[in-house]
Design a protein with these regions (language model features):
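Long, contiguous binding/interaction regions
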Residues: 2-81
Length: 81
């Protein structure tokens, strides 16, 4: 069976997010001062062939650990769509 899986990768909460800071500054320059914080990450969509949903999640998790997310600076979440 084919599963659509999304991997959400975000900077660790305790680390500075320079992209988020740049976006926040830009938003404030546009007069959108009510926005308090911005964190910039990435969404990666995979199409995975697997025997069941648990196997698809395991494959996506392994791909995230090995390549798609940097464990030193980022965390990830796997979501089956």
């Amino acid at each position: 069976m084919i599963y659509q899986v999304q991997i959400k990768v975000m900077p660790l909460k305790d680390l500075l997010d320079p992209q988020g800071k740049a976006v926040l500054d830009g938003l404030h320059n546009l007069g959108l001062s009510g926005i308090q914080d911005v964190r910039v990450g990435k969404n990666i969509n995979l199409q995975i062939e697997a025997v069941d949903e648990a196997a698809a999640v395991a494959i996506a998790t392994e791909a995230s650990k090995q390549l798609l997310a940097n464990a030193v600076m980022e965390y990830f979440e796997v979501v089956v769509l």
